[in-house]
């Protein structure tokens, strides 16, 4: 074994297995491409992206960690979102006020 080496189990690994999924249509109304990373709280994505932000509350893209989706200007596309997990707190983006996503 090499230090840091990871051995995965045989078979297919399903990302976000069992997580509820939400599909939303998104259009980039800006004049430049926009990329959104895998763990961005989707409603906080660039405001040139037009979609139902309230339906996306507490959700992120259903894509592998460290990847992103690129939205070209004027092009509509459908994305699949899954709930943010863990403590469900978002800090350092545009959430006003930052912090817990769910009411306490």
UniProtKB/Swiss-Prot annotation:
Catalytic activity annotation: urea + 2 H2O + H(+) = hydrogencarbonate + 2 NH4(+)
An example Gene Ontology biological process: urea catabolic process
Pathway info: Nitrogen metabolism; urea degradation; CO(2) and NH(3) from urea (urease route): step 1/1
EC number: 3.5.1.5
InterPro entries named in the record: Urease_beta-like, Urease_betasu_sf, Urease_subunit
Pfam families membership: Urease_beta (PF00699)
Listed GO MF terms: urease activity
Cystine connections: none
Broad class of the protein's primary localization: cytoplasm
The keyword Cytoplasm belongs to this UniProt entry's keyword annotation: yes
GO CC terms: urease complex
Transmembrane portions of the chain: none
Keyword entries, A-Z: Cytoplasm, Hydrolase
Subcellular location per the Swiss-Prot or TrEMBL entry: Cytoplasm
Family of the protein in this entry: Belongs to the urease beta subunit family.
Summary of subunit composition and partner proteins: Heterotrimer of UreA (gamma), UreB (beta) and UreC (alpha) subunits. Three heterotrimers associate to form the active enzyme.
Protein name per Swiss-Prot or TrEMBL: Urease subunit beta
Lineage per the UniProt record: Bacteria, Bacillati, Actinomycetota, Actinomycetes, Mycobacteriales
């Amino acid at each position: 074994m090499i230090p840091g080496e990871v051995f995965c189990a045989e078979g297919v690994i399903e990302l976000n297995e069992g997580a509820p999924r939400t599909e939303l249509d998104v259009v980039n109304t800006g004049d430049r491409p926009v990329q959104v990373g895998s763990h961005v709280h989707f409603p906080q994505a660039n405001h040139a992206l037009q979609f139902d932000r309230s339906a996306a509350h507490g959700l992120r893209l259903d894509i592998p960690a460290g990847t992103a989706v690129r939205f070209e200007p004027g092009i509509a596309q459908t994305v699949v979102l899954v709930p943010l997990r863990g403590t469900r707190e978002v800090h350092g983006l545009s959430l006003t006020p930052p912090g817990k996503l769910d009411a306490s």
